[in-house]
């Protein structure tokens, strides 16, 4: 929860004009308890900083059609029976090398029937221990090359199943079309009505990755056909670390023009659009660009 509280605090202080007075904040979440709790931590911190804020929090099933949508074709592509999984399993076998690790941990390593699975499980335990307040690490049971090998397989799967990998033919990023459409509609409504001051969505990393690839956010839509080079083109920890977030910050200039800036994980990023004011873009031009992406059915 501390991750989201700190994010909320930074957002509050970075954009004080948004969260002043009795501003209305609309927050929606996936029905996943984890996502709903993230929404709660984030918005409660905003309320602590300004008790006058009017915050509407919802986690309804009807929002799942855009917050966490995967098309039937996408589900089939990502399934364990998909044709691409055959070459991926060979890639896994090449990169997940458990022999040394098992021998270092167990007197009788041959008793471990699935050593690859054991190594992956230990990898995830080591990774997840970063999320608890223990002054202890399991990473030291691995050699550097072993960690890199397992990560390459994790990264490759995330890239193929969610990002702009040519292997999925754009199928997976297009699962984010409903979410992008909701963003455009919500932005236009807020610009016209002047409310809500902030429109917040709390969802899942895979769906954020798809959205970023679809929008062609800087560094998020790189393409590579060689599985051995996926890690050079796209890195999951850069695109979607713990608490990953995309922020669209809107500004109105003295001529009443609407500008927008994009922050990925609270860092300024660009779109493949020309602008004399980068990282600021004309909202009209951005909206046209994104609407064209949505229209490519």
Q: What do these predicted regions represent?
A:
Residues 1-2, 6-26, 30-297:
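Signature for phosphate-centric chemistry
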């Amino acid at each position: 929860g501390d991750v989201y509280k700190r994010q909320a605090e930074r957002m509050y202080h970075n954009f004080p004009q948004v969260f002043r007075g009795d501003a209305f904040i609309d927050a929606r979440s996936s029905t996943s308890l984890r996502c709903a709790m993230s929404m709660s931590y984030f918005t409660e911190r905003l309320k602590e900083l300004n008790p006058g804020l009017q915050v509407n929090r919802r986690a309804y099933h009807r929002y799942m059609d855009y917050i966490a949508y995967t098309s039937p074709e996408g589900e089939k592509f990502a399934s364990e029976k998909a044709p691409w999984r055959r070459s991926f399993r060979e890639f896994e076998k090449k990169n997940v090398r458990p022999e040394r690790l098992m021998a270092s941990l167990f007197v009788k390593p041959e008793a471990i029937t699935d050593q690859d699975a054991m190594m992956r499980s230990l990898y995830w335990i080591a990774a997840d221990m970063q999320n608890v307040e223990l002054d202890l690490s399991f990473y030291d049971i691995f050699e550097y090359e072993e960690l890199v090998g397992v990560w390459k397989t994790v990264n490759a799967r995330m890239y193929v199943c969610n990002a702009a990998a040519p292997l999925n033919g754009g199928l997976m990023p297009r699962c984010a079309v409903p979410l992008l459409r909701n963003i455009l509609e919500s932005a236009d409504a807020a610009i016209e009505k002047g409310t809500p001051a902030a429109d917040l969505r709390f969802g899942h990393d895979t769906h954020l990755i798809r959205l970023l690839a679809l929008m062609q956010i800087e560094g998020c839509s790189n393409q590579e056909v060689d599985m051995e080079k996926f890690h050079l083109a796209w890195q999951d920890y850069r695109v979607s670390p713990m608490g990953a977030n995309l922020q669209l910050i809107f500004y109105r200039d003295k001529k009443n023009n609407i500008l927008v800036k994009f922050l990925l994980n609270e860092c300024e990023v660009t779109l493949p659009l020309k602008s004399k004011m980068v990282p600021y873009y004309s909202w009209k031009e951005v909206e046209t660009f994104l609407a064209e992406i949505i229209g490519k059915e």
